[in-house]
Design a protein with these regions (language model features):
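Hydrophobic alpha-helical connector segments
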Residues: 60, 71-103, 110-114, 121-123, ...
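Short amphipathic alpha-helical elements of helix-turn-helix/winged-helix folds
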Residues: 18-22, 96
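Generic hydrophobic, amphipathic alpha-helix propensity
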Residues: 11-19, 36, 61-65, 69, ...
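Short, hydrophobic secondary-structure boundary micro-motifs
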Residues: 32, 105-108, 142, 193
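Amphipathic alpha-helical packing segments from all-alpha helical-bundle domains
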Residues: 111-162, 170-183
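C-terminal peripheral helix-coil segments that are non-catalytic and often amphipathic
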Residues: 128-131, 166-228
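Helix-turn-helix
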Residues: 14, 22, 26-56, 60
Length: 228
């Protein structure tokens, strides 16, 4: 027998799928309580048991679409080349933004800024990929700086490509943007002290938790010094 909680979850899932489909295909203006309720096979008042209004529904719909995207990224097994994995993740993210302009616009709208679970998970996946590069001695900046540079460049690239007039579209812009970021954050080869001290520092910070001779406090202090 289905419990009340299960029925509620099933109904909410129907609403979310209906709202997400309208958002993806027709944009925020199409996500009205009446249209969503019709698509979900419900009466409009039923939606207010789950959402306070249209803005709440829009945010939830955008989060639903992005959560599906992030979940698909988690199923991708890492390769032996962390830099190529980073490039593949970049391409996937750019493709998602271009294929879902309405969703991307809502997620990045400063007036609606929200730190959602899916966004946090997406940043974590990126941070893990950057961490693998640092562990390989290929990172010339801090992991935090690398993550922020990649995110900034990715958001800017998607926004630019979405707003360019068709006659000015540049199919190679995303690749060029990644290459520019890569030059800024990557060492050409695993670093040695005489080649790239910044990359050595980034790699050494990865090893700090594994140094048995240091206490947690000592490791934290050394990490603070290395960040400077």
């Amino acid at each position: 027998m289905t419990s009340n909680a299960q029925r509620r979850d099933i109904t909410r899932d129907r609403i979310m799928k209906a709202a997400a489909a309208l958002l993806r295909d027709h944009g925020p203006a199409a996500v009205t309580t009446r249209r969503v309720a019709h698509q979900a096979g419900l009466q409009p008042p039923a939606l207010y048991r789950f959402f306070q209004g249209k803005d709440d529904l829009l945010d939830a719909a955008a989060e639903h679409v992005f959560a599906e995207h992030v979940a698909s990224k988690q199923t991708t097994a890492p390769s032996d080349d962390p830099v190529e994995d980073l490039r593949a993740g970049w391409n996937t993210q750019i493709s998602f933004g271009l294929a879902n302009p309405y969703v991307y616009g809502l997620l990045l709208d400063p007036a609606r800024a929200r730190h959602t679970p899916a966004q946090a998970k997406g940043v974590l996946i990126l941070a893990e990929r950057v961490h693998r590069i640092a562990a390989a001695g290929r990172l010339r900046v801090s992991e935090e700086r690398a993550v922020n540079l990649i995110r900034s460049a990715g958001i800017g690239t998607v926004h630019t490509l979405l707003t360019l007039p068709p006659e000015q579209s540049d199919p190679h812009l995303a690749d060029a943007a990644f290459d520019a970021v890569a030059r800024a954050i990557l060492a050409d080869q695993p670093a040695v002290p005489t080649q790239d001290p910044a990359a050595v520092i980034a790699a050494f910070r990865i090893l700090l938790p594994e140094l048995p001779s240091l206490s947690k406090a000592e490791a934290a202090l050394l990490d603070e010094w290395l960040r400077r």
